[in-house]
Regions:
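Active-site and donor-binding regions of nucleotide-sugar-utilizing enzymes
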Residues: 4-9, 16-26, 65-166
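Structural beta-sheet core signal
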Residues: 7, 35-37, 100, 123, ...
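A generic structural motif
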Residues: 28-34, 233-235
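Conserved nucleotide-sugar phosphate-binding/catalytic loop shared by glycosyltransferases and other
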Residues: 32-75, 85
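A nucleotide-sugar donor-handling region in carbohydrate enzymes
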Residues: 42-47, 144-220
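Donor-nucleotide binding loops and adjacent catalytic segments primarily
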Residues: 53, 186-280
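A donor-sugar binding/catalytic signature common to diverse glycosyltransferases
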Residues: 100-101, 108, 123-124, 148, ...
Length: 295
């Protein structure tokens, strides 16, 4: 009997983690998946990254859930819209399992819909700690649901301490590293040519997201980072923040610094290009988890 997995992705970074899992599912004779992009993937404001997914896989459904507002209230409403959208998708697809990654509002909405429809949930990257924002409580809330694929032994132990049965917890490593290990990154020459960089000189990579419990500080925090960037004066690749509350305020600040010729800004990059630029960078600045895991 073939089991159908509904795989959910809402952001460019999350898709980079999900892709190697989907490739592994494709190779398994008793598994198949339906892929459901949502939220930032469908937004022109954040690079319309669904086009990158379409190069790799067939898309079975989408959930348009992202409100164009920069507040916690908008995030809460997006979760509600997403929960409704995913319930419709599950009714149509009838999955045996829902696969989600991490701690954002998109997997949270997908998990809420699944648990009330009695669909098992497989959660990757549970049991981890985030210093600030709503990410950690959201992650731990998802962690209370069904099957857990932890990236480290420490995360697995944390999940078990939260009361989850040991048989539900598996240590599988960080799937984002599979791409680094199994796929070829772009060459130094190709990255330099494509993004008009001089990689004989130091390169700074900046990726900073809003802290959702410090929304009012988002503009100031981005300004502080960019003032430091200007002070360094290195050629810089700067990628837009995510769509959480405060993200649009940060983008307004970023646009003021685009006047500096050594700062190149991008709404989004393909996962391979992002890893390739990271591989060439001398310094990475910001608060992206990729600066801890992939870097």
């Amino acid at each position: 009997m073939v089991r159908k997995i509904c795989a959910v992705t809402g952001t460019r970074a999350e898709y980079g983690l999900l892709k190697p899992i989907l490739l592994a599912i494709e190779q398994h004779p008793e598994l198949e998946f339906s892929l459901v992009p949502c939220a930032m993937h469908l937004s022109n404001e954040f690079g319309y990254t669904i086009k990158e997914i379409q190069k790799d896989f067939k898309i079975d459904a989408t959930v348009d859930m992202l409100l164009s507002s920069d507040t916690g209230s908008a995030m809460a409403k997006s979760i509600g819209i997403g929960t409704i959208g995913f319930s419709h998708v599950y009714e149509a697809i009838k999955p045996d399992l829902v696969l989600v990654i991490g701690d954002r509002l998109e997997p949270f909405a997908a998990a809420i819909a699944a648990v009330y429809m009695n669909i098992p949930i497989a959660h990757v990257h549970g049991g981890e700690i985030t210093a600030a924002g709503v990410d950690e409580p959201a992650r731990h809330a998802i962690t209370k649901l069904d099957i857990h694929f932890a990236s480290t032994e420490e995360s697995a132990k944390r999940i078990i301490r939260m009361g989850e049965d040991k048989w539900r917890v598996f240590v599988v490593g960080a799937p984002g590293l599979d791409t680094i290990l199994n796929e070829s990154l772009q060459s130094k020459a190709k990255i330099a040519r494509k993004y008009k960089l001089n990689l004989d000189n130091p390169l700074l990579l900046v990726v900073q997201h809003p802290v959702t419990t410090e929304v009012e500080e988002a503009s100031f925090q981005m300004c502080e980072t960019l003032e430091a960037t200007v002070e360094l004066g290195l050629q810089t690749v700067l990628i837009y923040p995510n769509a959480d509350a405060g993200g649009r305020r940060m983008i307004k600040v970023i646009k003021k610094y685009e006047k500096y010729p050594f700062i190149k800004t991008f709404k989004s990059l393909s996962h391979i290009d992002y890893l390739s630029i990271m591989n060439q960078a001398s310094v990475m600045m910001g608060n992206s988890s990729s600066g801890i895991i992939e870097a």
